[in-house]
């Protein structure tokens, strides 16, 4: 299950990392970063030490933006921003900057992150309407909302839901209502028509980079003057602050942006969004096919709503609605045994989210097919030994 490489004579075993984020990065990128750690591009310094205003760093952030535009085919009337605070800060920024005309917004609740976003907007005084929810079935599917109408300032969706392993197979029609999407866990895992959205954002630590930077793509006409944001909006939470200052109003997370730039070049080398998507479909199908044909495991997300990135699954010892102590104890025992033995076999971070239980394999862009195959081999062995 593990593969090895050597750094300066130290033998190190790499594990297959199925973490929901921060998650594995492409090995080629890590090697490049290691090689440039002490001296990047002949500057005699590490990117970690560079002044963000220096001629050494400027080309890095400019290239990162250019690569985002190229790979995501971003239309010219959109700004590409690099901000801090993760996806969670975007819950507030979206509300503060977009909820300013009627003060109303429509949210589709497909899980924890969409719900938190709606709660944050409501907290800031936006009149939030939850127009659809999949809570009735434990968020195991994406509700069909083909069309969103009304006097909303914006409509909000979480495009891929990491905890429940669900993903939109369609983009809701919103007419003149700007559509906002959290694409943190699926950015560049597939082709996406940016022009169908008013705003896209992605915390980078799942598919793009280490934690510390959030990518925002916003249509220019949706960026209000600071004074037009909701009352009391802090300067740092206005998109205009970042748009007017080339994402350098204050010190950006330089090193994270540098790694992001390298990951974008790695994606391009692998065929761009379309090429990566082909690989992602192959990986996900390999795992789902095994789960669907197994009498020991089952996937929790409904067909037609399944994520290519996050695959939660249960064993036969997880009984829906069980209250019997013995049954619950057995379930807990099997789950922790699975996680522990997987770890010993070099397959790490497979523990499921407490809301779903069981296990979860996050198989983002950087996870190779070999990692998924290693997981399935382990699952077969575990099923055989514990049936």
State what each model feature region is.
Residues 26, 204-288, 302:
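Active-site C-terminal subdomain of aminotransferase-like
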Residues 43-90, 97, 112, 120:
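Conserved N-terminal alpha-helix of the aminotransferase class I/II PLP-enzyme fold
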Residues 14-65:
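A glycine-/small-polar-enriched, mobile loop at the entrance of the PLP active site in fold-type I
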Residues 297-342:
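Conserved PLP-binding catalytic core of the aspartate aminotransferase-like
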Residues 9, 14-15, 337, 344, ...:
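PLP-dependent enzyme catalytic core of the Aspartate aminotransferase-like
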Residues 1-11:
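Short, Lys/Arg-enriched N-terminal segments with co-localized hydrophobic residues
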Residues 21, 121, 133-187:
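Active-site phosphate-binding strand-loop segment of PLP-dependent enzymes
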Residues 88-155:
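PLP-dependent aminotransferase-like
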């Amino acid at each position: 299950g593990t593969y090895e490489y050597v750094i300066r004579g130290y033998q190190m075993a790499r594990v297959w990392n199925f973490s929901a984020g921060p998650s594995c990065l492409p090995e080629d990128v890590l090697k490049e970063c290691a090689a440039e750690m002490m001296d990047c591009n002949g500057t005699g310094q590490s990117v970690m030490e560079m002044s963000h205003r220096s001629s050494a760093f400027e080309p890095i952030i400019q290239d990162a933006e250019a690569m985002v535009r190229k790979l995501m085919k971003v239309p010219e009337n959109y700004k590409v921003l690099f901000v801090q605070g993760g996806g969670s800060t975007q819950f507030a920024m979206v509300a503060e900057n977009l909820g300013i005309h009627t003060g109303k917004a429509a949210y589709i609740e497909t899980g924890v992150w969409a719900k938190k976003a709606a709660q944050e907007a409501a907290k800031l005084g936006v009149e939030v309407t939850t127009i659809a929810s999949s809570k009735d079935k434990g968020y195991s599917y994406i509700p069909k909302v083909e069309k969103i109408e009304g006097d909303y300032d914006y409509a909000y969706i979480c495009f891929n839901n990491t905890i429940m392993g669900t993903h939109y197979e369609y983009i809701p029609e919103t007419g003149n209502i700007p559509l906002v999407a959290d694409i943190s866990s699926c950015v560049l895992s597939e082709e996406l028509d940016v022009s169908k959205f008013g705003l896209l954002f992605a915390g980078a630590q799942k598919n793009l980079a280490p934690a510390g930077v959030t990518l925002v793509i916003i249509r220019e006409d949706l960026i209000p003057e600071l004074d037009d944001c909701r009352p009391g909006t802090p300067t740092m939470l206005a998109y205009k602050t970042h748009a007017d200052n080339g994402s350098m109003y204050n010190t950006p997370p330089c090193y994270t942006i540098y790694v992001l730039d390298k990951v974008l070049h790695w994606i391009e080398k692998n065929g761009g969004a379309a090429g990566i998507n082909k690989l992602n479909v192959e990986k996900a199908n390999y795992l789902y096919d095994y789960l669907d044909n197994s009498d020991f495991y089952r996937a929790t997300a409904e067909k037609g709503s399944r994520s290519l990135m996050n695959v939660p699954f249960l064993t036969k010892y997880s009984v829906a609605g069980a209250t019997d102590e013995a049954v619950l104890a057995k379930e807990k025992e099997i789950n922790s045994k699975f996680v522990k033995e997987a770890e010993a076999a070099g397959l790490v971070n497979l523990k499921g989210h407490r809301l779903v239980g069981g296990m979860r394999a996050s198989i983002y862009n950087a996870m190779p097919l070999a990692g998924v195959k290693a997981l399935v081999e382990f699952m077969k062995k575990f099923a055989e030994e514990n049936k």
